[in-house]
Amino acid sequence: MAWFLLVIAGIEEIIAAIAMKYIDGTRKKWPIIVMTVGFGLSFYCLSQAMIVLPAGVAYAVWTGIGSIGVSAVGLIWFKERFQLSQVISLCLILAGVIGLRLTSSS
C-alpha cells in the first residue's frame, strides 16, 4: 500500500506541476486551485508512504516520478525538445527509481 500511495503522490505532483505552467497572473483561477489541491494531496500521500518506507527512498522515488512525468508531459503535450544529454539523465533517474524499488525491503 505504501508504494501505491507513493505512485499516487508522484502523479499528483505531476498534475500540480503542469497546472503551474498555466498560471498567468490573476486571470485564471483553475490552475491555482489544481496546483494547490494537487500538491496538498501529493504531500499527504507522500507522508503516508513515509510511515512505512524509509524517508530517503520515498522522497527520491517521489521526486523521480515527478521529474520523469513532467518531462514526459512536456515532451508529448507541450512539444518541448530535449538534448541527448537530458534524455540520458532522465534515463538514469528512471534506473535509480527502479533500483530503489527493487532493493527496498518494504
From Swiss-Prot:
The keyword Plastid does not apply. Disulfide bonds: none annotated. It comes from the Bacteria. Keywords: Cell membrane, Membrane, Transmembrane, Transmembrane helix, Transport. It is a multi-pass membrane protein. Belongs to the drug/metabolite transporter (DMT) superfamily. Small multidrug resistance (SMR) (TC 2.A.7.1) family. The chain crosses the membrane at residues 3-23, 29-49, 50-70, 82-102. The keyword Cell membrane applies. It holds the Pfam family Multi_Drug_Res. The gene is yvdR. GO terms for cellular component: plasma membrane. GO terms for biological process: transmembrane transport. It is found in: Cell membrane. It comes from Bacillus subtilis (strain 168). This is Uncharacterized membrane protein YvdR. One of its GO terms (molecular function) is transmembrane transporter activity.
